[in-house]
A protein has these predicted regions:
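Bacterial N-terminal signal peptides that target proteins for export
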Residues: 1-7
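Patatin-like phospholipase
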Residues: 19-59, 67-325
């Protein structure tokens, strides 16, 4: 009897050791505004293939889809979410009080017909971030979703939070900022703060905007988290393979001009997309970042499903690799 017990325990220990050695799978979700609906379609196929995700990294809309997935929302939940939202209401929260005057200055920001056009040095005041939209509606929406996430519901005790990172860009220091699961709603909101579109997000001394400014397909981030196999969903349609910084002589001007000249986002993107093990690039050439109308959302979800289905064998291969070790 003691021998049988010993053998059983030895088998369990060996099984746990093998489990720990199984390759970790990372999911990368790129930015692209409304085109993020296609990522939901791809998630349907990833789940259908039985692939378990160990790490997630996302940028902009990919940060939102990935962040929500990390706290237990699944493809069916996100599908319903994308189809049922009144996106115009959700995104349209511009502060119209500034429209009362043609030109108005407040807290170091100059407004023209209600739109922020220039920042002056704020003295003794906290300057407001640029952006046509405050983004409060989006933040409140995300905060509610996170607070009521499936992983926090008692009946879903089997769900575990998936380690998650999202990318933002600090416009003051002109560098990448990697945000974690802490303050998830705020971090997702920062990652999708399109410059000039949404008000930037201030964290400590940083002024954060859309991570697409520096890393729109963060394959390197999910690798750094520990992923050995990476599935990347890329919403970008124009690849810029031959980008060679033609205005490099202007980089000495610094700031945004330096960014515009060097386009570090393109360089990083070209490096990252080649490093994905399973690369999924839905054909979204007929859609744009603002294609939030219900018909377009429905179409893009289906396009995402088809793109994922086209990679079904590769996705099954990922599952088999995980099971083989």
């Amino acid at each position: 009897m003691k021998l049988k017990t010993f053998i059983t325990l030895l088998f369990i220990a060996a099984s746990l050791s093998v489990w720990g050695q199984r390759p970790k799978i990372g999911l990368v979700l790129g930015g692209g505004g409304a085109k993020g609906a296609a990522e939901v379609g791809v998630l349907h196929e990833i789940e259908r293939a039985g692939v378990h995700i160990d790490y997630i990294a996302g940028t902009s809309i990919g940060a939102i889809v990935g962040g929500l997935y990390s706290v237990g929302y699944r493809a069916a939940d996100l599908d319903t979410l994308f189809r049922s939202q009144n996106w115009l209401t959700l995104l349209s929260d511009r502060d119209t009080t500034h429209c009362k005057k043609i030109v108005r200055e407040e807290d170091g920001v100059t407004y023209l017909f209600g739109f922020p056009v220039r920042r002056t040095k704020a003295v003794g005041k906290k300057a407001k971030g640029f952006g046509l939209l405050r983004g409060d509606n989006v933040y409140n929406f995300l905060d509610s979703l996170v607070a009521n996430a499936p992983i926090y519901r008692q009946r879903n005790t089997h769900l575990q939070r998936i380690p998650f990172r999202c990318v933002a860009f600090d416009v003051r220091r002109q560098n990448e900022v990697i945000l974690t699961e802490d303050s998830l709603a705020r971090n997702m909101r920062a990652s999708m703060a399109i410059p000039g579109g949404f008000k930037s997000v201030s964290i400590d001394s940083m002024t954060l905007v859309d991570g697409g400014m520096i890393n729109n397909l963060p394959v390197d981030i999910v690798r750094a988290m520990g992923a050995e196999i990476v599935i990347a969903v890329d919403l970008t349609q124009t690849k810029h393979d031959d980008f060679d910084a033609p205005l490099s002589f202007l980089r000495g001007l610094g700031g945004f001009i330096k960014w515009l000249v060097e386009r570090p986002d393109i360089v990083r993107y070209n490096e990252n997309r080649k490093q994905a093990d399973v690369y999924i690039n839905p054909n979204l050439k007929d859609y744009g970042v603002t294609s939030f109308n219900p018909n377009a959302i429905a179409d893009m979800i289906e396009i995402g499903k088809k793109a994922g289905e086209a990679q079904r064998e590769a996705l099954k291969g990922v599952k088999l690799k995980k099971q083989a070790l």
